[in-house]
């Protein structure tokens, strides 16, 4: 099997489930992209992706023409992507509260936010355990409400895969979705 196949296989089931809702035109932001597992998954589905992290060498090494990279300190006060607009934003295993309320202004109307990260109680299973990096109960729902997002799906649960953890997951639309939500995605 190829490295590309292995990377895609490691993509989050949450991202896999809701990626088909992303409008086909436009640019998808993979924020805190890490190894590029979601960038590569999205590119394999035909999306153009901007993969952003403090170290993007692993993503660059994938050599996919639909993926462009940008190396950024994600916790700087002034963030150069605030003026950009995306058709979707994907965030997994990353939380920096001072910037979370900036995400909606970077998302085009009718487009998708897919967010999944660790939640309170995760310290029982390992890292992260610092409360600064763990979502409080219902925090992503409160975020969605604060910014008038339509929630497609939300979970605040214990998972066993890829490792035992407490996570919150949100798929939400800014305004009305540009396309019909298929029944399989409706709660």
Model-derived regions: residue spans:
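Conserved beta-strand signature within the Rossmann-like core of class I S-adenosyl-L-methionine
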Residues: 111-122
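S-adenosyl-L-methionine
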Residues: 1-23
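Conserved class I S-adenosyl-L-methionine
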Residues: 25-34
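Class I SAM-dependent methyltransferase SAM/SAH-binding core
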Residues: 36-76
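Core SAM-dependent methyltransferase catalytic element
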Residues: 159-187
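A short acidic, Gly/Pro-enriched loop at the edge of an enzyme's catalytic core
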Residues: 79-88
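A short, conserved alpha-helix within the catalytic core of class I
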Residues: 95-107
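Short alpha-helix
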Residues: 132-148
């Amino acid at each position: 099997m190829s490295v590309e196949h292995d990377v895609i296989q490691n993509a989050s089931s949450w991202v896999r489930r809701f990626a088909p809702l992303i409008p086909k035109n436009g640019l998808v932001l993979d924020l805190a992209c890490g190894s590029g597992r979601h960038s590569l998954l999205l590119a394999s589905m035909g999306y153009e992706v901007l993969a952003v992290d403090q170290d993007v060498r692993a993503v660059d090494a994938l050599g996919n023409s639909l993926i462009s990279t940008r190396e950024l300190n994600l916790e700087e006060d002034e963030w150069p992507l605030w003026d950009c607009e995306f058709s979707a934003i994907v965030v997994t295993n990353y939380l920096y509260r001072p910037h979370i309320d900036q995400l909606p202004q970077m998302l085009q109307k009718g487009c998708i936010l897919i967010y999944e990260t660790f939640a309170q109680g995760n310290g029982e299973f390992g890292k992260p355990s610092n409360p600064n990096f763990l979502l409080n109960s219902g925090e992503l729902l409160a975020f969605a409400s604060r910014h008038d997002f339509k929630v497609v799906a939300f979970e605040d649960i214990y998972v066993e895969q890829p490792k035992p953890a407490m996570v919150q997951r949100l798929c939400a639309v800014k305004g009305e979705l540009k396309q019909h939500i298929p029944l399989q995605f409706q709660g």
